[in-house]
């Protein structure tokens, strides 16, 4: 446990951020998994719809600093390629 008051506050802030980041990353994984399942099933219409929502989530996570912007771009590119293969 920290003795310095500012570090105690940082610890509380970091814990809140960690929990928020964990929730965002979990929803990202769920969205990507749903898209991949639709793409694997060959449902192009549903996959296209899920791709749009997944891209929004990736962009939002990147803008909030949860993931790096290049990681978001790489995931979006890979998912778009998977959709185009259908």
From Swiss-Prot:
Gene3D superfamilies: Ribosomal protein S20. InterPro entries: Ribosomal_bS20 (IPR002583), Ribosomal_bS20_sf (IPR036510). One of its GO terms (cellular component) is small ribosomal subunit. Binds directly to 16S ribosomal RNA. Keywords: Ribonucleoprotein, Ribosomal protein, RNA-binding, rRNA-binding. The keyword Ribonucleoprotein applies. This is Small ribosomal subunit protein bS20. Belongs to the bacterial ribosomal protein bS20 family. Residues 1-25 are annotated as: Disordered. The lineage of its organism: Bacteria, Bacillati, Actinomycetota, Actinomycetes, Mycobacteriales. GO terms for molecular function: small ribosomal subunit rRNA binding; structural constituent of ribosome. GO terms for biological process: translation. Was identified as a high-confidence drug target. It comes from the Bacteria. The keyword RNA-binding applies. SUPFAM superfamilies: Ribosomal protein S20 (SSF46992). It comes from Mycobacterium tuberculosis (strain ATCC 25618 / H37Rv).
